[in-house]
Amino acid sequence: MNLHSHSISSLQGALTVPGDKSISHRAAILGGLAEGVTEVDNFLCSEDCLNTLRAMEQLGAKVDVLEERQGYGPVRFRITGVAMSPKAPERPIDCGNSGTGMRLLAGMLAACPFDSEMFGDASLSSRPMGRIMQPLEQMGARIEARGAKPGCAPLSIHGGRVHPISYTLPMASAQVKSAILLAGMFADGTTTVRQPAVTRDHTERLFRHFGVPCTVDGLTVGTCGPALPVAHDLTVPADISSAAFWMVAAASRPGSRLTLRQVGLNKTRNAVISALQRMGARMDIVPTSPEDAGEPYGDITVYGSDSLHGTSLLPEEIPNLIDEIPILAVAGALGRGDFIVRNARELRVKETDRIATTAANLRLMGVDVEEFDDGMVVHGGTPLKGTELSSYGDHRIAMSFLVAGLSAQGETVVTDAECINTSYPGFERDLAQFL
C-alpha cells in the first residue's frame, strides 16, 4: 500500500490518537497473569499489541471483547487472568514485528515450568535478543536463539524455577529491565535492576497498579517475589509517540491550532515535548487524568509557527524519546539551524536502522544530513521537495515522512505504508482529514 501527502496550509481541530503501545503490551501481560478479571479500555489494537494479547490467550488467559474498532480489533475487553499459573502453549508464539512483546514475554516464560518457542517476522528476527538472554539465564532459565543471525529469534525457552538476581544493565533499556522484573515476580526473593539512565517506567507503574511489590531507589528498580497481581481495571492513555507526529505537523505549519486529547504525560516519556519546546514549538498542556489513574494523561494543544529551529538532544533524553527521533529529525529539517542527535546507537537495531533510513529519506527530500555511527546532524532550513520514499517496512519511518510531506513542495508518496498498523491503526484516516 502506498500513501500520499502534500503541502497544507494548517492543521485545525482536535484528534485522539490510539492507545499507548508500551502500556498496552504490559496491560495484556499483567492482566493475563493476574488473579481475577481486569477491564482494559483504549487498548491499542495494533498488530504488535494484538500478538501479545493472543499470546496471553495461548497461555490460558480468557479475553471477552466489549468493544471493537472496526477493521482492527478490540479496544475494550475483559481479561481473566491465570493467577500466575500460565499453561504451556500448544504451538509457537508469534510476536510478529514486536521486540517489546518478545522481550517481555520471554521474561515471563523464563519462569514458567514448561518449554515454549517464540518467533517473529524478518525484521524482528534480525533484532538482538542476547540482551535479555544473559540476565534470564543468570536467573536459571535456558534460552536458545535459533535465528540465522547470532542472538536472534526464533527463541526456544526452557523455563522453570528462577531465582532472584541483582543485575546492572549494560545499556538503558526498559524492555530488558521489564523482562527481568517479570521473571522476578516468580522468583523467591528480591530481584533488582540497576539502570545507567532513567528509562520509561510503565512496568513499575503497572506493577503497583496490580498490587505487585515494586521499589525505586534512584536508578535501581526492584520487585519481591513470588508475587500475585490482583486484577485492576485500566484505561490506556493515548500514545505520546503517536501524538508526536501531529505535534510536529501542527508546530511546523503557521496558523495551526491542534488539540491532542488524553495523551499520556508520563514524565519518563515526555522528553519529546521538552525537545520540541526547545525547538520553538508552542504548546498548552492541561492534565485531565484522575488521581487514581495508573498513568497520567492530559490534553496537548499545539500552535503552529514559522520559527522552529534546531537543537541538540541531551544524552539523558535519548532513552525516553528513542522512538520519536525520526519525527524530530523531520522537525529539525523544517526548522532553521542544526538538529543534532548523538549517543543514539540503539536506533541502528530498531525495526530498521533508523539512522540510515531517516537520513536517506531526508536526503531524497533535499535535506543535508551528516550521519554518524551513533546519530546524525540534520541541517535545516532548506525547503523540502516531495518525492517517492520507502517506508523500509518501518511504521515510524512511514508516518514521519508522510508528515514531512505536509510541508513539502509537491506530492510525497511513501511506499509499503501498511506497516503503520504496527503502532497506529487509523493513521491513514486521521491524515486524510487534513489533506
From Swiss-Prot:
It comes from the Bacteria. It catalyses: 3-phosphoshikimate + phosphoenolpyruvate = 5-O-(1-carboxyvinyl)-3-phosphoshikimate + phosphate. Pathway: Metabolic intermediate biosynthesis; chorismate biosynthesis; chorismate from D-erythrose 4-phosphate and phosphoenolpyruvate: step 6/7. Its main location: cytoplasm. Its EC number is 2.5.1.19. Coiled coil: none annotated. InterPro entries: Enolpyruvate_Tfrase_dom, Enolpyruvate_Tfrase_sf, EPSP_synthase, EPSP_synthase_CS, RNA3'P_cycl/enolpyr_Trfase_a/b. One of its GO terms (molecular function) is 3-phosphoshikimate 1-carboxyvinyltransferase activity. GO terms for biological process: amino acid biosynthetic process; aromatic amino acid family biosynthetic process; chorismate biosynthetic process. Keywords: Amino-acid biosynthesis, Aromatic amino acid biosynthesis, Cytoplasm, Transferase. It is found in: Cytoplasm. The keyword Cytoplasm applies. The active site is at D323 (proton acceptor). PANTHER family: AROM/DEHYDROQUINATE SYNTHASE, PENTAFUNCTIONAL AROM POLYPEPTIDE. Monomer. Belongs to the EPSP synthase family. Catalyzes the transfer of the enolpyruvyl moiety of phosphoenolpyruvate (PEP) to the 5-hydroxyl of shikimate-3-phosphate (S3P) to produce enolpyruvyl shikimate-3-phosphate and inorganic phosphate. This is 3-phosphoshikimate 1-carboxyvinyltransferase.
